[in-house]
Amino acid sequence: MIKSFRDKETKKIYHGYRSLKLDQSMQRVAYRKLKMLNNAYDLKDLLAPPSNRLEKLKGGLEGLHSIRINDQYRICFRWYNQDAYAVEIVDYH
């Protein structure tokens, strides 16, 4: 379950509101993936579909995980006790 958001734009998308951060088609995908993250009981639940490409991040982002929205955008989050914290949509380019 999502417990906190790192930014207000990601929270808006999760609650079904329009954001200027992403175009409309990208927001639909982000919304679907955020709902998937919210429903995940275990990190392994995010392994499907394979297009999520669940990753444990390294370096300066150690402690974070991500799933892909597309090649450019990812949803990054901290996973602790079966919950997601500091959820945010990040532009990787």
Region spans (language model):
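Basic, amphipathic alpha-helical segments enriched in Lys/Arg and hydrophobic/aromatic residues
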Residues: 35-37, 41
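Enriched for short, Lys/Arg-rich terminal
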Residues: 55-58, 64-93
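Residue-level signal for pocket-adjacent positions within structured domains
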Residues: 8-9, 17, 41, 49-52, ...
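Arg/Lys-rich, positively charged N-terminal/basic patches that mediate binding to nucleic acids
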Residues: 1-33
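A short, surface-exposed loop/turn module that caps and links secondary-structure elements
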Residues: 41-65
